[in-house]
């Protein structure tokens, strides 16, 4: 491919030494693209930093940002990457978690979709996998709803790929965020809401592009079973989910906060609040009971 796209990959890491070699091998083996990997390591207690430094010494595509700050979570670490990396030499920008395995054509598929003019941002389904060998498709590719981005992300952030122009606008916005927002609002959810609220076209590919590792240290994990629904119910019952929604809306679309905080508005528009039908009715049930 003579006209291969150039992709900047933003990788946030923390105590990730066990899975990083496999992850980096899968990223480095991407087909028909040119790439650079920008790494921000949260203050860790294992050999994560040394692993990246050793890899960077052998691979000029790996760039490790300055080390020593305690970010306290994946989101502020990603916001640091978004704010500091220079995207001027890249066509597209992708997020990467520290412990997943990318399919070889992950970036090529994303680049093809974005170059076709059909979308401004790309994400995809993923194949979750566990240490016991179990695998499961995590389907996030339902049709978008008018307000879904205020109540959920587009899926795992490790599948997100942005056109340069979109990322530059997002970068400009992230640089203005106060510190407490960077700790409260997940980077992938904010990225999705920012883009959708500003009219950027978002494609969720039904074809999985990543093997999404599940283990005890996952920041979010899957939301695809009854255990997940129990956790979601607990978040709703304690008002934590509502606080997250309102914090997000107040950040990316403060003019909409009055509506999104209004129970009657949400009841009237419940069909627009989530992409998946069963999630819409689950949220409706929570609204009717006054739990949300």
What does each of the following model-derived ranges do?
Residues 1-226:
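Nucleotide-sugar donor-binding/catalytic module of glycosyltransferases
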Residues 173-180, 190, 211-292:
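C-terminal subregions of glycosyltransferases and related glycan-biosynthesis enzymes
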């Amino acid at each position: 491919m003579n006209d291969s796209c150039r992709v900047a990959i933003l990788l946030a890491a923390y105590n990730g030494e066990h899975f990083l070699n496999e992850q980096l091998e899968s990223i480095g083996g991407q087909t028909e693209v040119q790439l650079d990997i920008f790494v921000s390591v949260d203050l860790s207690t294992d050999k994560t930093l040394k692993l990246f430094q050793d890899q960077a010494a052998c691979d000029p595509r790996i760039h490790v940002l300055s080390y020593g700050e305690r970010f306290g979570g994946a989101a502020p670490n990603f916001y640091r990457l978004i704010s500091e990396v220079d995207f001027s030499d890249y066509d597209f920008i992708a997020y990467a978690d520290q412990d997943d395995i990318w399919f070889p054509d992950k970036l090529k598929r994303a680049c093809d979709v974005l170059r076709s003019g059909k979308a401004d941002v790309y994400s995809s389904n993923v194949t979750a996998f566990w240490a016991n060998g179990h695998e499961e498709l995590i389907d996030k590719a339902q049709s978008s709803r008018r307000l879904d981005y205020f109540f959920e992300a587009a899926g795992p952030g490790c599948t997100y790929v942005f056109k340069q122009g979109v990322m530059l606008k997002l970068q400009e916005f992230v640089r203005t965020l106060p510190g407490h927002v960077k700790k409260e609002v997940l980077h992938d959810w904010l990225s999705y809401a920012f883009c959708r609220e500003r009219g950027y076209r978002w494609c969720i590919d039904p074809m999985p592009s990543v093997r999404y590792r599940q283990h005890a240290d996952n920041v979010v994990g899957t939301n695809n079973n009854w255990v997940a629904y129990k956790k979601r119910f607990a978040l709703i019952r304690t008002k934590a989910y509502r606080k997250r929604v309102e914090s997000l809306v107040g950040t990316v679309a403060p003019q909409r906060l009055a509506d999104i905080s209004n129970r009657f508005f949400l009841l009237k528009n419940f069909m627009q609040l989530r992409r998946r039908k069963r999630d819409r009715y689950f949220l409706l049930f929570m609204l009717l009971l006054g739990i949300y």
